[in-house]
């Protein structure tokens, strides 16, 4: 199946968990992103608020481990949170500070 799974989101880094490492030595940083915006749905304005868990791997994990409270623009894809949970987690592939 060739379905797209692409996410682009501007959000606040609400919480940063301690960095950890895989057995292969890859840095893993779990964060919580908080997003608020007005969207148009069915011709009406709709206020959207959400928090979503997200994960950053590798060099970017090291760079963002002390950036709680920063607004960012992220791009990535949705995946299951763990082998035992089908709850979604945003897997971040690109992250940069949001300048508005």
Curated annotation (Swiss-Prot):
Q: Where is the SSB domain?
A: 1-99
> Could you state one GO biological process linked to this protein?
DNA replication, synthesis of primer
- Sorted alphabetically, which SUPFAM superfamilies does this protein's record hold? Nucleic acid-binding proteins
Q: Which residues cross the membrane?
A: none
Q: Please provide, in alphabetical order, the Gene Ontology terms of the cellular component aspect for this entry.
A: primosome complex
The UniProt keyword set, sorted, is: DNA replication, DNA-binding, Primosome
This chain's function reads:
Involved in the restart of stalled replication forks, which reloads the replicative helicase on sites other than the origin of replication; the PriA-PriB pathway is the major replication restart pathway. During primosome assembly it facilitates complex formation between PriA and DnaT on DNA; stabilizes PriA on DNA. Stimulates the DNA unwinding activity of PriA helicase.
Its family? Belongs to the PriB family.
- Which NCBIfam families does this one have? PriB_gamma
* Matches recorded under HAMAP family: PriB
Subunit structure, as described in the record:
Homodimer. Interacts with PriA and DnaT. Component of the replication restart primosome. Primosome assembly occurs via a 'hand-off' mechanism. PriA binds to replication forks, subsequently PriB then DnaT bind; DnaT then displaces ssDNA to generate the helicase loading substrate.
Name of this chain's protein? Replication restart protein PriB
């Amino acid at each position: 199946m060739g379905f797209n799974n692409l996410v682009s989101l501007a959000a606040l880094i609400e919480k940063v968990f301690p960095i950890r490492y895989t057995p292969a030595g890859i840095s893993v940083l779990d964060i919580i992103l908080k997003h608020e915006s007005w969207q148009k749905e069915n011709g009406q304005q709709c206020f959207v608020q959400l928090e979503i868990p997200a994960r950053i791997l590798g060099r970017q994990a090291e760079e963002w481990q002390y950036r709680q409270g920063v607004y960012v623009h992220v791009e990535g894809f949705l995946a299951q949170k763990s082998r035992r949970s089908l709850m979604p987690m945003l897997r971040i592939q690109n992250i940069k500070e949001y300048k508005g």
